[in-house]
Amino acid sequence: MAKQPTRARKRVRKQVADGVAHIHASFNNTIVTITDRQGNALAWATAGGSGFRGSRKSTPFAAQVAAERCGEMAKEYGVKNLEVMVKGPGPGRESTIRALNAAGYRITNIVDATPIPHNGCRPPKKRRV
């Protein structure tokens, strides 16, 4: 008996008007994730995944390209308004927000959620070049 070919159902994309852009800007890379209000990820992009390797990965331009890519993916879900949460001290903090603004999103709120230790772990030793 021949097996019936099972067809995968076309996935219905939910429409979300308001989203949250989580920007994690480390010294080495920038990760941009756009979620809905509940925290379910809709789209994400990184500077490294956008084609930048090595020291170019940690530049503001690489963060800008990652934000543009993430913004294009989130447009498919109908996101129009973004609340921005920035974490980390990296060089891509400001350029990411500018790129999201230029991509046509209305930025409603910007929150700096950088984790600051209350004298927690010992920091890495200073570089001697």
From Swiss-Prot:
Identification of the protein by name: Small ribosomal subunit protein uS11
Keyword Transcription regulation: no
GO biological process, one term: translation
MF terms in GO: rRNA binding; structural constituent of ribosome
PANTHER family linked to this entry: 40S RIBOSOMAL PROTEIN S14/30S RIBOSOMAL PROTEIN S11
UniProt KW DNA repair keyword: no
The protein's assembly and partners: Part of the 30S ribosomal subunit. Interacts with proteins S7 and S18. Binds to IF-3.
Gene it is expressed from: rpsK
Entry function: Located on the platform of the 30S subunit, it bridges several disparate RNA helices of the 16S rRNA. Forms part of the Shine-Dalgarno cleft in the 70S ribosome.
UniProt keyword list: Ribonucleoprotein, Ribosomal protein, RNA-binding, rRNA-binding
Originating organism: Aliivibrio fischeri (strain ATCC 700601 / ES114) (Vibrio fischeri)
Similarity field: Belongs to the universal ribosomal protein uS11 family.
UniProt-listed PROSITE patterns: RIBOSOMAL_S11
Cellular component per GO, a single term: ribosome
Domain of life, per lineage: Bacteria
